[in-house]
Amino acid sequence: MGAQLRVYKRRIQAVTATKKITKAMEMIAASRIVKAQRKVAASKPYATELTRAVTAVATGSNAKHPLTTEVETPTRAAVLLVTSDRGLAGGYSSNAIKAAERLRERLASEGKEVDTYIVGRKGVAYYGFRERKVEDSWTGFTDNPAYSDAKSIAAPLIEAIQKETAEGGVDELHIVFTEFVSMMTQNAVDDRMLPLSLDDVAEESTRKGEILPLFDFEPSAEDVLDALLPRYVESRIYNALLQAAASEHAARRRAMKSATDNAGDLIKSLSRLANAARQAEITQEISEIVGGASALADATAGSDK
């Protein structure tokens, strides 16, 4: 009985130490979510206005440009997958990977080859384990991305969209990331960045009661679009990275809270078992004392006779 009680006590100590760690990680993630939310909110107006500017240029001219011109029969697409560098975030990375797999299957069914680009060690490990080709990858900043990270990611993607497919280029550019909706809701989504769908933007503007402005372009609409292309791709990627970071922190906070709650329940269960073992040990000791006293009394009574 004593050995069993010691086992329970050691397990309670181990679970208590784990609970302290998960509680600390929960609090750290909660504090980082607030900062990430502010960055997301700050980046959205820039990305929105840049998209409107590109749409205004495209609708106000007949220029053919990778930003806005769809290929009649696209044959190759690039997919940028955003995952996390670290684990302990529930199904955050796996949900994004599943969304990327669904997108890849859809593009393949449309007769398009898929070039994969990955952000985050989890995605790199997933594709590496399955020996799948990855065009390029970036790691080390998923929980706190900077605009410079978005620029480094955008560079090879812009180069690919500007090339002909015969030279290794792509006709479409897609991104898969986790959209931050609220502290409790984060959704893995896929979005086509290029070519930009002018009909969707115009429809959204109409729904909001906005009128797209008309411009005169100097020196030309093509030159303006050339200047806007890298800014547009960088801003879209940066906003996606920020939303993914906020989603990662929210998922980690939720996972750590669940782990902390489970640790608390386990401690209660182990404490009950330890108390039961202690009571059984005490009962056994009392029984032994009573039994010994009874035997001694019987022996004494026998000697008196």
UniProtKB/Swiss-Prot annotation:
Annotated membrane topology is: Peripheral membrane protein
Under the heading InterPro entries, the entry gives: ATP_synth_F1_ATPase_gsu (IPR035968), ATP_synth_F1_gsu (IPR000131), ATP_synth_F1_gsu_CS (IPR023632)
Task: State the CDD domains in the record.
Answer: F1-ATPase_gamma (cd12151)
Query: Know the name of this protein?
Result: ATP synthase gamma chain
User: What parts of the sequence cross the membrane?
Assistant: none
Assembly behavior: F-type ATPases have 2 components, CF(1) - the catalytic core - and CF(0) - the membrane proton channel. CF(1) has five subunits: alpha(3), beta(3), gamma(1), delta(1), epsilon(1). CF(0) has three main subunits: a, b and c.
Highest taxon, organism lineage: Bacteria
Q: Which PANTHER family match?
A: ATP SYNTHASE GAMMA CHAIN, ATP SYNTHASE SUBUNIT GAMMA, MITOCHONDRIAL
Q: Which GO terms describe its molecular function?
A: ATP binding; proton-transporting ATP synthase activity, rotational mechanism
UniProt-listed Gene3D superfamilies:
3.40.1380.10, ATP synthase, gamma subunit, helix hairpin domain
Instruction: Note the Pfam families from the entry.
Output: ATP-synt (PF00231)
The UniProt keyword set, sorted, is: ATP synthesis, Cell membrane, CF(1), Hydrogen ion transport, Ion transport, Membrane, Transport
Q: What does this protein do?
A: Produces ATP from ADP in the presence of a proton gradient across the membrane. The gamma chain is believed to be important in regulating ATPase activity and the flow of protons through the CF(0) complex.
Intracellular or extracellular location(s): Cell membrane
Q: State the Gene Ontology BP annotations.
A: proton motive force-driven plasma membrane ATP synthesis
Task: List the GO cellular component terms.
Answer: plasma membrane; proton-transporting ATP synthase complex
Q: What is the lineage of its organism?
A: Bacteria, Bacillati, Actinomycetota, Actinomycetes, Kitasatosporales
Q: Into which family does the record put it?
A: Belongs to the ATPase gamma chain family.
